Structures are given as structure tokens and as C-alpha cells.
Amino acid sequence: MPAERPRILYVSDLAYPARGRRYCDEDIHLTSRLREDFDLALCHPRDAAALMDAFDAVVVRNSGPVLGYLDVYDDFRRRALAAGTRVYNPLTGKGDMAGKQYLLDLTAAGFPVVPTVDRAEDLPLLPDAGRYVVKPRLGADSIGLRIVSRDKAAEAADGTVLVQPHVDFAYEVSFYFVDDAFQYALYAPHTDRRWQLEPYEPTAADLEFARRFIDWNTVRHGIQRVDACRAPDGSLLLVELEDLNPYLSLDAVDDTRRDAFVAAMKTSLRRFVTGSA
């Protein structure tokens, strides 16, 4: 049974050079607030496996793309699953945590997602487009993303990358959840400055869209971000379901929503650590 103040190992790469944002500021703020309720230590993702046995739970936050330390992450994941270590988010997520296969699965299942294939013979299944997006299955932060012609997309589509039509969207919007509870939404009104986010008030239809993916993923405890784009016909299409270490852009929300998010995270984390519903 965890102590009255559970021990949390908080995993973050404070020096990760994110474009247009400072991951470290967000984690400095979050850890300062979590310390009000938990005994907390912070470590680099490369050190997590060696340290985690001394803690009641591991919280993975802004740890950077796992491509930069894939062998280390795979070892951490294997050891945590074998030992039954409580990892927040749980390592059973079906979104980005497991790679980009879910984009293919959701496309095949008819979900409202940017259509995605990985084989040249499946390109005819995509809407006709003048340009196509090619990206790696384990990509993050646009690492390895290319915009190419149809011929180049066909050459690249060998099963190791994903191919999507280039969507001329109006804007991108993100929905942030703790467990299955919606917290806030942000959008990038200027497509040429996609890192500059502003508060967004979602409609009931917007929230219904986002909740479809939260329900599909069945992550009972944790933080998820549903990234979408507003297509030319006005509909929303899923771009990414981030369930490993979603950046939260807490600096873009007001104090009231920031405090509400922290409170929701504390409640979720305590329930997760104690094993309560």
C-alpha cells in the first residue's frame, strides 16, 4: 500500500530543444504543484528504468521523442511491464505510444481520420491530392516528415512509412483530457505559426469527435491529447492521438483552467497509485 504521500518518479528531458516552446518550463510548473501532494523526484528518460523500483509510480511527461533513445525506452517498457510498475500513462495505450499503426487501423475502420496507407498498391484508396505527406511510423514533432508528389509517395510507400494526402486545412485544434474528462482545447489559427496556440471553445460536435478516440483508446488513467485539423468541408479529421507524453501547452491557458487541470491530474494520479476506481 503506497504511503500517505506516494512517491513519484517524474520523467522529463528538461534540455529537449522543442521548436517554438520550452518543455522544461511546463515540467517545472507541474512538478512544483505535484509536490504539494506527492513525494517527487525528477529524472531523465535514460535513467528511469534504473530508478523506478524505488517509487510507487512513474509519471512520463515531456520526455522527448523515443526515436532518440529507442533501445532505452524499449528496455524501460519491458522491465516496467514485467515488474508491474505503475506507469502514468499506462503502457497499454493504442495511440502514439504504440507507433503510428493506429492511423492505418482507424482509416480501415472508417473513423474520421486523415486517410492513411503504407503500401503503394493502396494509394488509390486515398483522395486525389496534388501533394502527399510521407512520415515515419515512429515519428514525432514532424521528425522525418516530407511533402512529396504522388510518384514519390508511391516510391516511398514500402510498408515502413505512412502516406497521407496533404490536407489544406483551415486550422489545427487539440483537445486535452485527463482520464476520460475533457479539460480544455487550443488551436492554431495561423497555419504558418502552428506552435502559437490560443484557447478554443469546442462545440458539442467537436467534443463528440474527440471523445470517440478517447473511448477507442480505453486508457482509464492518464493524460491524452487529441490533435485534429479542420478540413475544407468543415469536418474534423484526426491527425494524432498522443497518449505517451503529450505536451500540454499550459502556458496558453488562463490560471483557472491551469489550476483545474492540475487538480484533475492530482486526483487521477492518486487514484492510479492507490488502485482505486
Where are these regions (language model features)?
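A short beta-strand motif that forms the metal-chelation/ATP-contact edge
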Residues: 55-60, 135, 175-177, 184, ...
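Short amphipathic alpha-helix with an adjacent loop that forms part of the alpha/beta core around
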Residues: 47-54, 123-127, 152-154
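Phosphate-binding site of ATP-dependent enzymes
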Residues: 141-237
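Flexible loop residues that form catalytic
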Residues: 13, 63, 121, 137, ...
